[in-house]
Amino acid sequence: MARVTVEDCLPMVDNRFALVLLATKRTRQLMAGARPLQAASKNKPPVLALREIATGKVRFDRSVRDALSGKFDKEKVNIPAGQTRTLR
């Protein structure tokens, strides 16, 4: 089978970072026993997840910008100049 690349998936997702989140989530679902949306193959779960994204079978149910905008508007972090902080 042909290789799946990030460029194959980008038309289906807003940006590369969203693609990573979506592929990770779908890979974890597949590893937990979720049924594949494509014909069974010998591909590993990450490859299968990318194939499903590239064909449009897996997608976000709302835009990434909408999903994240509310989250970051609520959280404000004040760090004094010259200091660093690890957010957990």
Swiss-Prot record:
Its EC number is 2.7.7.6. GO terms for biological process: DNA-templated transcription. It holds the Pfam family RNA_pol_Rpb6. The keyword Transferase applies. GO terms for cellular component: DNA-directed RNA polymerase complex. It catalyses: RNA(n) + a ribonucleoside 5'-triphosphate = RNA(n+1) + diphosphate. It comes from the Bacteria. Keywords: DNA-directed RNA polymerase, Nucleotidyltransferase, Transcription, Transferase. Promotes RNA polymerase assembly. Latches the N- and C-terminal regions of the beta' subunit thereby facilitating its interaction with the beta and alpha subunits. Belongs to the RNA polymerase subunit omega family. The RNAP catalytic core consists of 2 alpha, 1 beta, 1 beta' and 1 omega subunit. When a sigma factor is associated with the core the holoenzyme is formed, which can initiate transcription. This is DNA-directed RNA polymerase subunit omega. The gene is rpoZ.
